[in-house]
Curated annotation (Swiss-Prot):
The keyword DNA damage appears for this protein: yes
GO cellular component, one term: bacterial nucleoid
Keyword Isomerase on entry: no
Annotated protein name in UniProt: DNA repair protein RecO
Stated role: Involved in DNA repair and RecF pathway recombination.
Organism: Synechococcus sp. (strain JA-3-3Ab) (Cyanobacteria bacterium Yellowstone A-Prime)
Length: 301
C-alpha cells in the first residue's frame, strides 16, 4: 500500500520514547479511533512541535500512513505525524495531584475502551467533556465525584456499565442498602442475591448507593448539594473499576494514588460486609491496589 495522508482530530493519551529524539504518540481520534503515530524530533529541547505532543492536548492532525504490504494490518503499523495544530489543551490539570490523577485515570480508561480504525466520536467527545469538568473543579474535594461520574459515562459508551440505580435482575428500584456484583451486572437486591447464590458480592451502604444512583445523570449536583463523604465516592469508584478490570482483564494503574490523594484509609473505602450478608471474599476482591505510582505512569505518557 502506498503512503497517503489523512486529517483527524485527536487527543494525545500516551507517549513512548522512540530512539533518541522521537516519540510514539497514542491518540484517540474522532474519525479513526485509536491511532499510533511517530512525532519525529518531539523529544528534542527545541522541537518544532512545542507542547503539541504533550498529554491531554487536542490537535488537528495531518497523518502520513507510511508504506506497507497489503498483507500487513494497518493498526499494527506506525504512522507519522506530518502536521499538528492545537485546538485545545488543559493546563490547569496540573494544579494538584488529584486533578492529574483523575485526568490520567480517564485517559487510561479511554485507552482500554477505544477501538482502532473506526470512528469513536462519542468516546472522544465524552472524554474531552469530562476532562473540561475536572480541570474546572475548584478544589480537590470536587474532583473525585467528577472522576467517578466520568468513569461511569465512559463505561456506558464502552457498553460495560453496570446497573447503578435498580437491581440488574428484577429491575426493582433500590433504596437504603443493596449489594453489588461486578461479575453479574451491578447492583442486586437481597432476594435476587439469595436466589441466585451470588458470590462474591459487596454490601453497598446507603451513601454509596446514593453516589452510584446519581451517575446516569448528565451532570452532578453542586458540591454543596451532594454533600456525600469522599469515602462513599471512593467506594463507588472501586466498584466501577472492578467491572472494568474484569472486562479488560487488567488493572487500572492510575487508580493507585486515589486513596492517598484524599487521605482516606483504604479500609474506609471498602464496602463493608456485615455478618451474614454478602461474602467475605468481597473485601479481598475490591481491595487490590496496583503498585504503580502516578509519577511513573505519567512518565509513560
Amino acid at each position: 500500500m502506498s503512503g497517503v495522508t489523512y486529517r483527524v482530530t485527536g487527543i494525545n493519551l500516551k507517549a513512548m520514547p522512540l530512539g533518541e529524539a522521537d516519540r510514539i504518540i497514542t491518540i484517540l481520534t474522532r474519525e479513526q479511533g485509536l491511532i499510533r503515530a511517530v512525532a519525529k524530533g518531539s523529544r528534542k529541547q527545541l522541537s518544532k512541535w512545542g507542547g503539541r505532543m504533550e498529554p491531554f492536548v487536542v490537535n488537528d492532525l495531518l497523518v502520513a500512513r507510511g508504506r506497507w504490504s497489503a498483507q500487513t494490518d494497518p493498526s499494527q503499523c506506525l504512522q507519522r505525524i506530518a502536521q499538528a495544530e492545537t485546538l485545545q489543551s488543559f493546563p490547569r490539570l496540573g494544579r494538584s495531584l488529584a486533578h492529574l490523577t483523575a485526568a490520567q485515570y480517564l485517559a487510561e480508561v479511554a485507552l482500554l475502551l477505544a477501538l482502532p480504525n473506526q470512528p469513536q466520536e462519542e468516546l472522544f467527545v465524552l472524554l474531552v467533556e469530562h476532562l473540561e469538568r475536572i480541570e474546572q473543579a475548584p478544589a480537590t474535594e470536587a474532583v473525585l465525584p467528577l472522576l467517578v461520574h466520568g468513569l461511569y459515562h465512559l463505561l456506558v459508551v464502552g457498553g460495560v456499565a453496570p446497573s447503578v440505580q435498580a437491581c440488574y435482575s428484577c429491575g426493582e428500584e433500590l433504596a437504603g442498602e443493596a449489594f453489588f456484583s461486578p461479575h453479574a451486572g451491578g447492583l442486586v437486591c437481597d432476594p435476587c442475591r439469595l436466589a441466585q447464590r451470588l458470590s462474591p458480592v459487596a454490601w453497598v451502604s446507603s451513601s454509596v448507593l446514593q453516589a452510584l444512583g446519581s451517575l446516569p445523570n448528565p451532570t452532578l449536583p453542586s458540591l454543596a448539594e451532594r454533600a456525600l463523604p469522599l469515602a462513599s465516592w471512593l467506594a463507588a469508584e472501586r466498584l466501577l473499576r472492578r467491572v472494568l478490570e474484569l472486562h479488560a482483564d487488567r488493572a487500572i494503574r492510575s487508580a493507585g494514588l486515589l486513596a492517598s490523594c484524599y487521605s482516606v484509609p483504604v479500609a474506609e473505602t471498602l464496602p463493608p460486609t456485615p455478618s451474614g450478608q454478602g461474602s467475605p471474599v468481597a473485601a479481598a476482591a475490591f481491595s487490590e491496589e496496583d503498585s504503580e505510582t502516578l509519577g511513573s505512569n505519567l512518565k509513560k505518557l
